[in-house]
């Protein structure tokens, strides 16, 4: 069985959409953390994680099909989707780290 280019492209579009939403939430989480609103930052990074999980689920479906022997034609939108997924996963990891950094900086500033 072969996944059609259209099916692969649709998964690519889904990856871009979910990962794009996740990226937006992660950037807003950084903004909230910088402003000292750590509850909002954590809420937004969790939303980013949920969105990236949806993107990852889309990716996993195609990977499972390919592992099962389905032939895949790579489309440019799929490459873009994969790129967006991976860079956003990294951004979410870094956002979690930076929220902790901003919180620590705020704690140190409050000690002065």
Curated annotation (Swiss-Prot):
Q: Which GO terms describe its cellular component?
A: cytoplasm
Matching entries from PROSITE patterns are given as:
PTS_EIIA_TYPE_3
Point out residues bearing the modification Phosphohistidine: 80
Query: Cofactors per UniProt?
Result: Mg(2+)
Q: Which residues form the active site?
A: 80
The organism sits in which domain of life?
A: Bacteria
Please name the GO terms that the record assigns under molecular function: metal ion binding; transferase activity
Q: Which GO terms describe its biological process?
A: phosphoenolpyruvate-dependent sugar phosphotransferase system
Protein name, entry field: PTS system lactose-specific EIIA component
Name of the gene this protein is made from: lacF
